[in-house]
Curated annotation (Swiss-Prot):
This is Kallikrein 1-related peptidase b22. It comes from Mus musculus. Keywords: Disulfide bond, Glycoprotein, Hydrolase, Protease, Serine protease, Signal, Zymogen. Residues 25-256 form the Peptidase S1 domain. It comes from the Eukaryota. The gene is Klk1b22. GO terms for molecular function: peptidase activity; serine-type endopeptidase activity. CDD domains: Tryp_SPc.
Length: 259
């Protein structure tokens, strides 16, 4: 099974592909029940893989580095390890990684690698039922403002050093920073199709297990979790999110061409 550890130690020269240990919420809090009805849990077979976002009844958005050959999708979940009557299970009929994402990086990530275009659309095999606990979220129409307070959510590890998924969906509030902050912090390229968000004092972050999940700034979906540093939550090292305003045309075109 292929999965990429995208959260890299700052001094690391490169990293090989490894079993799924994705990005997580660190220093956050239990999300209010059903407060994130667009949140998706993406599984590879029966193993939790990544987060995702419901865009409409037929489409889920996640990170391209979450690519696998089979998926199980859960909608409307609050608890990762418990059955919930309101949750919905779906399969994926086809996946659409962004064509400009460098898929060779699923094997290894050398120093200076460019992880731009880290997004993927998943076409559900059966439309989601829209309910009080399963709702899509709109794509952004304007650029996010620097300094905005953003909310990230996911079931990634709540332990900084040991991979430990929580049962309850976690939320964390973080700030949006100029990309120059992340350029100084990371050994990989930071480009204009990325967002830089986190707490400069450390302690609050996404990390292993949150990849593909939403970043909502001032109430608007602006990003999905992409990559960052290990250990997560270090001072002066915000994480990287795919900047969705740069990709709305591709997302809409892909959805329209694959009804």
């Amino acid at each position: 099974m292929r999965f990429l550890i995208l959260f890299l130690t700052l001094s690391l020269g490169g990293i090989d592909a490894a079993p799924p240990v994705q990005s997580r919420i660190l220093g956050g809090f239990k999300c209010e029940k059903n407060s994130q009805p667009w949140q998706v849990a993406v599984y590879y077979l029966d193993e939790y893989l990544c987060g995702g976002v419901l865009l409409d009844r037929n489409w889920v958005l996640t990170a391209a580095h979450c690519y696998e050959d089979k998926y199980n999708i859960w909608l409307g979940k609050n608890k990762l390890f418990q059955d919930e009557p309101s949750a919905q299970h779906r399969l994926v009929s086809k996946s659409f990684p962004h064509p400009d994402f460098n898929m060779s990086l699923l094997q290894s990530v050398p120093t200076g690698a460019d992880l731009s275009n880290d997004l993927m659309l998943l076409r559900l095999s059966k439309p989601a039922d829209i309910t009080d606990v399963v709702k899509p979220i709109d794509l952004p129409t304007t650029e996010p403002k620097l300094g905005s307070t953003c909310l990230a959510s996911g079931w990634g590890s709540i332990n900084q050093l040991i991979y430990q998924n929580p049962n309850d969906l976690q939320c964390v509030s973080i700030k949006l920073h100029p990309n120059e902050v992340c350029v100084k912090a990371h050994i990989l390229k930071v480009t204009d199709v990325m967002l830089c968000a986190g707490e400069m004092n450390g302690g609050k972050d996404t990390c292993k297990g949150d990849s593909g999940g939403p970043l909502i700034c001032d109430g608007v979906l602006q990003g999905i979790t992409s990559w960052g540093s290990t250990p997560c939550g270090e001072p002066n090292a915000p994480a990287i999110y795919t900047k969705l305003i740069k990709f709305t045309s591709w997302i809409k075109d892909t959805m329209a061409k694959n009804p």
